[in-house]
Amino acid sequence: MNLGIIGTNFISDRLIEACADLSQITIYSIYSRKMTTGTEFGAKYGVTRVFDDLEAFLSDPELDAVYIASPNYCHCSQTIAALNHGKHVLVEKPAASNKTELNQMIAAAEKNHVVLMEAMRSAYIPGYQWVREQLPKLGKIRSAQFQYCQYSSRYDKFKEGVVLNAFNPELSNAAVMDIGVYALYLFLMLFGKPETVQASAVILHNGMEGAGTALLGYKDMVGTVIWSKITEGIGPSVIQGENGSIAIDHISQFPAARMILRNGEMAEYVNNGPANNMCFEAEIFADLVAKKTVDRTFDSSYILKDTILCFDVMDEVRRQTGIVFPADK
């Protein structure tokens, strides 16, 4: 599969490095708004097909699929353009600015019979499956607290009056979209749709959400999801059942997790796999594309079902906390 890259930031570096050991994927071309930027980026990986014209990039008949790691507000338009050219798409999280955009993207994927997948790396790493397998041992789940709080490297500049892209809400940026999505996504994968959502947020002087919390209500349990780009979290995410608890270190990386039961039983997961955990999502995407070539009934709504649910909740969080993007208008 010949894969083209849209976006030349660090996350594109990580994806390309993750693909290095995957025989199914060849990094084929680069798109950047500036030719010099794209050429310099491609040179690091020996990629010489570089474009600063999106139409020309997508019109290449040898291009099979596209990885999109541009700013959030670009995801929808660039994804739909790629899908309409018959290219499979792996789009960075958050896949879109809102649920409306996501639905438009899914419709384009289904119309063009191509794969659309969100690059939510933590959903595909082995640690998540380990937690899912241990859950029955906890008995009835009564409480879960997931958190992802990471002091942004760009926040000091923001406090000095320099607003970089990461703190610009005009680009569909918010703490819930940028890092809260990791914790919310995994929480919803494990526990499903909540009956109630109660959200609060810290809004910075330019309208950017710096931190937030969602209380998620269920019939038999309560959930709390916390995120922040302006503070540093030090504790694990925790699932508490009547028979015991599971603690998960760093929800987006899953380096380790521990289960302790009231009867004294203990178990531990330690990630001994690749340091770059984006290899798992890349391999699954390649497998889905290969499957699509023989199975024309592939349903993008199914592979994106957790993304759809996450956007339902994130849209409600933003509605309650007054976070509005240009894409919402």
Predicted ranges, named:
Residues 65-67, 284-329:
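C-terminal helix-rich "cap/oligomerization" subdomain common to oxidoreductases
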Residues 104-122, 142-143:
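Rossmann-fold dehydrogenase core element
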Residues 271-283:
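Active-site loop of classical SDR/Rossmann-like NAD(P)-dependent oxidoreductases
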Residues 1-45, 326:
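N-terminal Rossmann-like dinucleotide-binding module
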Residues 183-255, 283-288, 292:
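Contiguous beta-strand/loop segments that form the cofactor/metal-binding neighborhood of enzyme cores
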Residues 122-195:
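Predominantly a Rossmann-like dinucleotide-binding segment in NAD(P)-dependent oxidoreductases
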Residues 45-108:
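Beta-loop-alpha module in the N-terminal Rossmann-like domain of NAD(P)-dependent dehydrogenases
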Residues 51, 91-92, 116-118, 248:
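Hydrophobic residues in well-ordered beta-strands that form the structural core
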